[in-house]
Amino acid sequence: MPLAQLKEPWPLMELVPLDPENGQASGEEAGLQPSKDEGILKEISITHHVKAGSEKADPSHFELLKVLGQGSFGKVFLVRKVTRPDNGHLYAMKVLKKATLKVRDRVRTKMERDILADVNHPFVVKLHYAFQTEGKLYLILDFLRGGDLFTRLSKEVMFTEEDVKFYLAELALGLDHLHSLGIIYRDLKPENILLDEEGHIKLTDFGLSKEAIDHEKKAYSFCGTVEYMAPEVVNRQGHTHSADWWSYGVLMFEMLTGSLPFQGKDRKETMTLILKAKLGMPQFLSTEAQSLLRALFKRNPANRLGSGPDGAEEIKRHIFYSTIDWNKLYRREIKPPFKPAVAQPDDTFYFDTEFTSRTPRDSPGIPPSAGAHQLFRGFSFVATGLMEDDSKPRATQAPLHSVVQQLHGKNLVFSDGYIVKETIGVGSYSVCKRCVHKATNMEYAVKVIDKSKRDPSEEIEILLRYGQHPNIITLKDVYDDSKHVYLVTELMRGGELLDKILRQKFFSEREASFVLYTISKTVEYLHSQGVVHRDLKPSNILYVDESGNPECLRICDFGFAKQLRAENGLLMTPCYTANFVAPEVLKRQGYDEGCDIWSLGVLLYTMLAGYTPFANGPSDTPEEILTRISSGKFTLSGGNWNTVSETAKDLVSKMLHVDPHQRLTAKQVLQHPWITQKDKLPQSQLSHQDLQLVKGGMAATYSALSSSKPTPQLKPIESSILAQRRVRKLPSTTL
């Protein structure tokens, strides 16, 4: 976005002449003293410790599942451990060929392993194993399912300053920890900040990190991504941990504005801009954000915030972070603004399909030079926690088999993995069938969606992001054959909610309260995340088993569901929604939420009365039903209503209010006495009409509603202007 150009906001440093060949500052001009041996192997001091008696790992201990990424140094695979004590656990495996690494790159790799082995912090990726073969080096790291911050920043979400503050605060704690160990990160950029499944950050890729080596604790290497480089890194005058705080400022600027502060047409021009350009401060930023940026963008590193004796404490004390509770943040008790859409432990939907579509293959390494193994001597490492008593309970591990596949770029077809059985249900644009997974003989349901009639991307994303909720149907697998999309979900063996209730010989008001509580709690969770279902008819609320326990209810069929988005198609965080959304957008969102509550009101009425509120019989026309709905006319007397509690009638009336903006919210439903005091409700039996009459009336009600309004067609988020502008292509190399 265009930035308002102001007068010179930051002081300038004297510009160091650039080498015309490569755009880099020459060593002598930059104050870098040449070394007679070029300092290649002496660039860092490598220290190494391995726990005595620990069992070493090797490549045979890991099953290759998918390619997650590929860069100049090697590939990253998703792997599953197949040996004890952590068999079944998923990791990211970074594989590097010794023969293709230059000496300097080998030092970087050894350095990355040493740094990761020494660092244990909630916001830094954890190293679990490190080992080598004759031709390759292996780093076994946390598998972080949320992908990298760059993908989130560029393709999906509208962040506010409060949202950015969360990520920057976690990042400050991670950097502070590295600095306390004498480590300069030097490659801070969104691509190296990963998200876990909850949305917390993890710093990764330590190939350019460096432990300070001279008496002034300065490093001199020219490294990092040029747009994020500090001036002292560009001119090679020697840099300390203060260089990371400049990069931190660049990241903050990019997240707040969507653009980089210094970016030329090529590398040389970018470095020139970093050293001498005037930059206008965007006036739409808060004064606190502007103040922090000015304090970080000091070209003299000695004057930069964070460079003083207190280090990161200077950053943490800045007024921009006045609302952050740093202790709660460190304990991961502050809720992230964005939750990645990942469901199963080995989902890789958020990794570039250029890589995840490839067959994972760890090719034999070419034997390196004779000295290579000596250079990497002592490379093996086993995380301490893995050697503890295996009898102790551990966190839930991934199952030994996986049915989750990648959505795009596969050469797989649904019938390769599943046997299709009978039809369960038919809709206007999809059909649902029972299916059996061939490898495990497990039963599932598959929803086959005709892509020419509906774009399923929103439904898939919502199920991935929120399907972990205990009362939302779980998405197990996704296939795409260009004409149809196949959504494999858990099988609802207990059938529809109304079928179960109306077939019971005994159903009471108290039981109805427990049912509504479970469903309302789930709807309140969705609404709090900016998601509206918009099709909460009873046939989309099913039991996962035949127990009839309300906790076994699942909300299904998110085909009409929506996530709250900005005009450019990007998702809005709750903070963004609360502060920056136009009233008409909020009004529409409130209307959709009101429709969900109305549907729950219809369900509640039917459970209590034994018949539907607006359809009186098979002879009703859609026009008659719509007239009753629009006038808000329904009866609360006679039949079961003579014995139903007054609090129940009050709740029904407030949920079925004719004005959607005057209906109770899901949160208010949960706070209603009929829900909070359910144990005091009557347990007398409620009578009901014939099951088919009730279901017929319900079907007629929703049929009349659907015929009265057109269904909006939602476009995929990839079609948004901002998403298209920020699409990038990662470099491809062969390992």
Curated annotation (Swiss-Prot):
GO biological process: hepatocyte proliferation; negative regulation of apoptotic process; negative regulation of TOR signaling; positive regulation of DNA-templated transcription; positive regulation of hepatic stellate cell activation; positive regulation of transcription by RNA polymerase II; TORC1 signaling
Active site (UniProt): 187, 535
Sites where the protein binds ATP: 68-76, 94, 424-432, 447
GO molecular function: ATP binding; DNA-binding transcription factor binding; kinase activity; magnesium ion binding; protein serine kinase activity; protein serine/threonine kinase activity; protein serine/threonine/tyrosine kinase activity; ribosomal protein S6 kinase activity
UniProt cross-references to SMART domains, sorted A to Z: S_TK_X (SM00133), S_TKc (SM00220)
Domain Protein kinase: 62-321, 418-675
Family: Belongs to the protein kinase superfamily. AGC Ser/Thr protein kinase family. S6 kinase subfamily.
Name of the molecule in the record: Ribosomal protein S6 kinase alpha-1
Provenance organism: Rattus norvegicus
Taxonomy of the source species: Eukaryota, Metazoa, Chordata, Craniata, Vertebrata
Gene: Rps6ka1
